Design a protein with these regions (language model features):
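Membrane-interfacial amphipathic/re-entrant helices at transmembrane-helix boundaries
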Residues: 1-25, 54, 65-69, 95-102, ...
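Transmembrane alpha-helical segments of polytopic membrane transport and secretion proteins
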Residues: 1-9, 86-94, 284-292
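Inter-helical junctions in multi-pass inner-membrane proteins, predominant
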Residues: 4-16, 142, 164, 168, ...
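Cytosolic-side transmembrane-helix boundaries in multi-pass membrane proteins
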Residues: 8, 118, 178-185, 189-192, ...
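Single transmembrane alpha-helix segments in multi-pass membrane proteins
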Residues: 8-60, 83, 87-99, 236-243
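Helix-loop-helix "hairpin" substructures at the membrane interface of multi-pass membrane proteins
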Residues: 19, 141-219, 242-248
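Alpha-helical transmembrane segments within multi-pass membrane transporters and channels
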Residues: 30, 63-107, 114, 247-252, ...
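Transmembrane helix-bundle core of multi-pass membrane transporters
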Residues: 91-166, 193-196, 258, 263, ...
C-alpha cells in the first residue's frame, strides 16, 4: 500500500468536508426526531434514500435538473412523513418507548421492499447535468456538484437553526421537547408540533439524500448505510443540535475521505464507523452534549 502524498491528502480533506456537509443535512432529520420527539426513528434511512429515488423519478418524468427537483422530492417526503407521525407513531407512543421503535423498523422494511418492487435493486445515480465540471482552487479540484450540494446543505441547516431558535414555532417546539405535559397545559399543540417536526425532519433528510444521490450511487439497501451514518453524525454532534450535527457531519466526511485515500473506497464506511465507536466510548454525550 502506497501512502498518499500531501496533495492527495489535501484533496481528500476538501472532498471530505464538502461531502460532510451533505451528510449533516441528511442526518439533521434524525437529530430533530430523536432530540425533540424522543423517538429513535429507524425509518430515517428510507426517508433519505426516498429523496434520491423520488428525484430520480421526477427527473425521468420532466427531464429537469435534479438540483431543481430535489426540493420537490423533499416536500413529497415531508408530506408522507406527517401522517406517519400523527396517525401511526403518536397512537402507539403510550405503550412505551419500544413500540414506536418497532413501528419505525416495520415501516422501514415496508418502504425498502416497496422501493425494490418499484425501482428494482439496480444501482442508480442522479445525473446533475454538470458532468465533470470542476473548480481548481490552489491545486485542489472541487467538483461543481459537490460544491453546490454543500452550499445548499449549509444554507438549509442555517435556516433550520433560525427556525428552531429564533421563531415562535421554534420556541413552542423546544417547550414541547423539554416537557410535553406542561407545554400542553399552557396551550401548546404538542401533537401537531410533533407531526410537523417529523415532516420537517423527513423533508431535510430527503433533500440530503437527493444531494448525496448526485455524488454516490444508491440502491434501496443504501438506507442502512444512511441510517448508520446518521446515528454516527447525531452522536458526534449531540441530540437536537443543528450546529453540532453540521460539525459532526463534517468530521465524519473528513474521516471517510481520508480513510478512502489511505485504504481505498471499500474501507470508507468501516473506518468511519470504527472512529465513531471510539468517539462514543470516549465522549458518549457528543461534542456539544453535557454529562448527566
Amino acid at each position: 500500500m502506497s501512502l498518499p502524498d500531501a496533495a492527495a491528502l489535501l484533496q481528500a480533506a476538501v472532498s471530505g468536508l464538502l461531502l460532510g456537509a451533505m451528510f449533516a443535512l441528511a442526518a439533521l432529520g434524525l437529530s430533530l426526531v430523536v432530540g425533540i420527539i424522543r423517538i429513535v426513528n429507524l425509518l430515517h434511512g428510507e426517508q433519505v434514500v426516498l429523496g434520491a429515488y423520488l428525484t430520480y423519478l421526477l427527473l425521468g418524468m420532466s427531464g429537469l435538473n435534479p438540483l431543481l427537483l430535489a426540493p420537490l422530492a423533499a416536500l413529497l417526503v415531508a408530506a408522507l412523513s406527517y401522517p406517519i407521525e400523527r396517525w401511526l407513531l403518536q397512537p402507539v407512543r403510550r405503550f412505551g418507548e419500544e413500540v414506536p421503535l418497532l413501528t419505525t423498523f416495520a415501516l422501514s422494511v415496508v418502504v425498502q421492499n416497496l422501493l425494490v418492487y418499484g425501482f428494482g435493486g439496480n444501482t442508480r445515480v442522479l445525473d446533475s447535468g454538470l458532468g465533470a465540471a470542476r473548480l481548481l482552487v490552489g491545486g485542489v479540484s472541487i467538483p461543481t456538484v459537490e460544491l453546490l450540494g454543500t452550499l445548499i446543505a449549509v444554507l438549509v441547516c442555517a435556516a433550520v437553526q433560525v427556525l428552531i431558535t429564533r421563531t415562535a414555532f421554534g420556541r413552542a417546539v423546544r417547550a414541547s421537547a423539554e416537557d410535553p405535559t406542561a407545554a400542553a397545559v399552557l396551550g401548546v399543540p404538542v401533537r401537531r408540533l410533533h407531526a410537523v417536526t417529523y415532516a420537517l425532519a423527513g423533508g431535510v433528510s430527503a433533500l440530503g439524500g437527493a444531494l448525496l444521490g448526485m455524488v454516490f450511487s444508491f440502491t434501496p439497501s443504501s438506507s442502512v448505510e444512511y441510517l448508520l451514518t446518521g446515528f454516527a453524525v447525531v452522536v458526534l454532534g449531540g441530540l437536537g443540535s443543528v450546529a453540532g450535527t453540521l460539525i459532526g457531519g463534517l468530521g465524519l466526511g473528513l474521516v471517510e475521505s481520508l480513510s478512502a485515500a489511505f485504504f481505498g473506497d471499500g474501507y470508507r464506511l468501516f473506518t468511519a464507523l470504527l472512529a465513531f465507536l471510539l468517539f462514543l466510548m470516549l465522549r458518549p454525550q457528543g461534542l456539544f452534549g453535557r454529562r448527566a
